[in-house]
Amino acid sequence: MSGSYPFIDIAALDSVREGFARGDAQLVLAHDLSTVLWVNGPGAKLFGYNRVEDLIEGQLDLPVATRRQIAAFSSENTSAPSAVAVRLGGGLRSELTHLHVSNIKLPDGVAALLVATQMPDNSAEAAISGLGDDSTHIALVDAVGKVVAASPRFALLDISASTLEDLIVEAGDATDRIVKRRIRTGSHSVPGAIARLTDTPALHLLCIVGDAPAQFQTAAEAVPLPDNAEAVLEEILPEQGDAPAQQAQKTHAEQPRPKTFAFDHDAPPARFIWKVGPDGTFSEISPDLAAVVGPNSADIVGRRFSDVANVFGFYTDGSIAALLLERDTWSGKRLLWPVEGTRLRVPVELAALPVYSRDREFLGFRGFGIVRPAEAEADPEEIGLALAGGIPQNRKPRKEPAETARMVGEDDVLALSEEVANDDQPAAVLPKPPLDITPTPGRRDSDKVISLLNSCAQEKVAADQAKFLKEKERATRPEGGLTKTERNAFREIAERLRKQGLANTRAESETPVSETSSIEPVEPTPPVKTRSEPIQPDETALLANLPVPVIIHSGDAIHYVNQALLDITGYESLDDIRSAGGVDVLFNSESDDGETRQSMVLRHADGSEEPVDAHLNAIAWRGGRALMLSLMPVTAADLPAPAELPAANDEEKQALEAHVEELKTILDTATDGVVLIDPEGRIRSMNHSASALFGYERDEAEGKFFSMLFAIESQRAAMDYLHGLSGNGVLSVLNDGREVIGREAKGGFIPLFMTIGKLPHTRGFCAVLRDITQWKRTEEELTNARKEAERASNQKTEFLARISHEIRTPLNAIIGFSELMADEKFGPIGNDRYRDYLRDINRSGNHVLALVNDLLDISKIEAGALDMQFEAVSLNDAIGEAIALMQPQANRERVIIRSSFQSNLPDIVADSRSIKQVALNLLSNAVRFTAPGGQVIVSTSYELNGDVVMRVRDTGIGMSKSEVEQALKPFRQINALEGRKAESAKDWRNEGTGLGLPLTKAMVEANRAQFAIDSNPGQGTVVEIVFPPTRVLAD
């Protein structure tokens, strides 16, 4: 099971484990609501997937409505689950599903969303459905170690009951409810983990990673005997009348043998993974090594590397032990590993890198190795036999000429079979079998003769002939076949090989046939192919006479080159090629102009190059394995015709070069950093500004990944931005840039704004990075200033609230006593002047109280602390109540109030108390500043664009633009131009608090409406309040 987080780590989270045990469908999403971080089997089934692996780390395409519902919850900072009803599926099969969405924290602290729902099937089998494969095994275990449910191949692990009980005890003692360690399965140990899901009743989730031991037994039997093996053995072994020792040996061979490990010499190279701790002790090794060298030979977990090296005999100079102490990355270390049950050892190449914790604590090494069974060689100490439990023989079996010939023949057949396996189709002509067991009349069965049909050279001729026929058959295919030049060359090679083979056949026909004098006893271990015979001189002679250049090499080591290769390259000998650099100096994968060719490029001794076609085969070479590379020069007819280019214009070339230099200078002059990126996400180059911005030299950053320029928290965002532009999605069209955090070479951080664009010809990208440190500083200063202003406003509001409370108490007493004295309830005052003084005291007290109330209201509005209850308000009714309250005052001032309300006016969404206060303030100002005989007109209307408008027009004295601006400021009164008042009118300008219009405007804006005033001196004033369509409850 893949994924960024181990499956069991998320399954053991407190918010996940109980639902997992119940069999709920669970899904963990990233906050983009597309990336699936984790899912269980029922969750995968809920969204139409059969396997968990099909959905983890994938993209989930949720419906737009579903995403909107989940996104609305994700913005809430709460961990409590929220019920969301969504429709899953599509078309006619869409079903309403109730999901529970909650915010969770992943093991590394990253925030994510858990989406869960109950499923009708809550069985244990349903809880682990969709989990487990050939290498991953899942089981649910109860409190006593009983397996409640398991994946299909879990039983093959053969885990004992005592092991399960120990795991349950360890999981109960673990603070994080998880135990991870190697678990014994049969005769092997594999990595695994167990998590305690529930306590009452106790239920545990067990995860095992690794193949079942039965598969190793199957691999040990994977090399079957030929069909005629029994007949051959009966023909070779002695009869009943032979020596007693031979008879006893036959009886032993007839007994059934236990299944043991069998070494497969022809197996391909295998790759395995290994880990060691800080002290050099092996903590983990993958089963791939055991499949090649045997389970006993690979059973090194828990042993120190130095001890294993001493026992297995590959501890030579101590270089690997020294590298383990240096705690640095290393590779290319080669050692010889003994093979269980054989006298062989196989080469193993090791590489490793150090592992550190988040606290930079050294945890050991993690590495990989490559074991090459085809390059096995004889082990003089025969350690492999001791690993299998056998005792090495004191005497070595004597090889007869026929046995030696048989081994050589097998090598040739192996080389031919590998060449056939590398082709796409079977060969048309198959070679004859190399061995022929022919009974001879008149002889005893013990004297049967095993004769060779061909020598080593004849087998090579047959192999090359079969290969030539196969290549001839493939030449008819439309793609990948040989060219006409290659077919002619191979016909010439085949003719020469045929003639050489006939000459060798005639020479060998005169050689007497060797016979075997005795048959060696059958070893208890499986037979192993030996490759100790050197190659025949005839084979080298054949290669030397070939007109085709041939190279025989193993990796970077060249073993042989023929004269044709020396002639074409211009080197004098093989030693000259080795001293010049070996294989690397002969070939160039790219041409001078940087364009990669389909064919290889052969480099001559003088530095010139020539395109060639190459054919690679695996062959047997001097007791080992090697690669034969045959080359064929590409003729002019095979090369594509170059396009005819116009004659180069030196002036245009110079102008183009000058233009390129100008562009480079412009990029270096730009203050923004510019970075060029290749399609693989590596840095190609950067300008001077980018180099100075990050503190890297140009050559130091080239070739490294683009993500190195960013802080850890911004690396994923930057790479997602880059990958999004690589496709043809929305990002490639709507490219609005990203804010990221850059990382300097010395470890500092820089806020950046990054914009990336695609380069048309190279398929790369261009990133423009701008330092926004000053912007961020200004933004921070503005934020701090806003917080300071809000704090000052809150202090002002708190101050006014306290002052209001302190002033109200004495004011209420003054107003109340003045009214009581003016009413003369306790006796006459006796003087009218005292009565006037009492009325002045009462009026002044009410004026101060109104001023305090207005101050408190406007401060609350500015601080956003005014309690407003928005509801449906009938604007006509609210204005009508205000007119009714102002009508007595208008009558005393001899001012006519007229109203014009539109019928069927829709209600508005507003605060009813503040709307009435606004209407009262506007009517009060209009009546107070209108001379007797004037008019005040109040109207409402419903505009075509959906606005509801309220207008208050008067015929008063009016104001100029400067006076309007002054009137809209708090505590400002208009005290100029007093001569405009009528003779019988009193001084309206000296009354009021200067808060009428500012408070009215603040209340209007608090109700999400617009306030406008238009006034002209001597013509009156019009105040207009507009409620937008969003605040209108239209039918």
UniProtKB/Swiss-Prot annotation:
Protein name per Swiss-Prot or TrEMBL: Cell-division control histidine kinase PdhS
Subunit relationships: Interacts with DivK.
Cellular compartment(s): Cytoplasm
Reaction(s) catalysed (UniProt annotation): ATP + protein L-histidine = ADP + protein N-phospho-L-histidine
A Gene Ontology cellular-component term: cytoplasm
Region span, Interaction with DivK: 614-1035
Role played: Functions as a polar differentiation marker. Essential protein that, by localizing in the old pole of dividing cells, controls cell division and maturation, probably through control of DivK phosphorylation status and cellular distribution, which in turn regulates CtrA, a transcriptional regulator of the minB operon. The asymmetrical localization of this protein is probably required for cells to enter a new division cycle.
Region Important for polar localization: start-end pairs: 1-613
GO biological processes: cell division; regulation of DNA-templated transcription
Region Disordered: start-end pairs: 500-533
Superkingdom field: Bacteria
EC number: 2.7.13.3
Domain Histidine kinase: 802-1031
Keyword annotations: ATP-binding, Cell cycle, Cell division, Cytoplasm, Kinase, Nucleotide-binding, Phosphoprotein, Transferase
Keyword Cell cycle set for record: yes
Domain PAS: from-to ranges: 659-730
Phosphohistidine found at: 805
Gene for this chain: pdhS
Alphabetical list of PANTHER family matching this protein: OSMOSENSING HISTIDINE PROTEIN KINASE SLN1, TWO-COMPONENT HISTIDINE PROTEIN KINASE
Source organism: Brucella suis biovar 1 (strain 1330)
Pfam families with a match to the protein in the record: HATPase_c, HisKA, PAS, PAS_8
GO molecular function terms listed in the Swiss-Prot or TrEMBL record: ATP binding; histidine phosphotransfer kinase activity; phosphorelay sensor kinase activity
The keyword Membrane is annotated on this UniProt entry: no
